């Protein structure tokens, strides 16, 4: 796999071990993919930004890259600040990339194309998930996310890898086949 997801505690407590393990396995990216609800404050986001820049620098020096994976909560305003914007505006673009989850950004009220335009080359990885009309997850191609339009911005995004995914499939093999077939039809 080109990337791995790790909890923030691994970065805080054993950054060198995380980097060494990822290099041994052959990952290109180490991705931090979750912030616990109690840590979703502006003060804590600012601490994470410092940590991400520091860890991103360690990764770069070791020949690997660091990225952050979004969910919907980064789009909820906190005292007039959208955490996703804070993360993108204040992390070093040469040290911190982002894995753009197209379902979660959409569910959070963000527009993937607008974010790609505003922050070019910051999203080298995408999670391809679809959203039903009721905002639940559905198989790719069966929902409301316009992947064909979004993929027109893959170069501006800096896209290197995308992952077809669904968090809650009733039959994972059926979901994988349907989603794969839907992406193939896009001829991207």
Region spans (language model):
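Histidine-acidic metal/acid-base catalytic patches
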Residues: 26, 81-100, 104-188
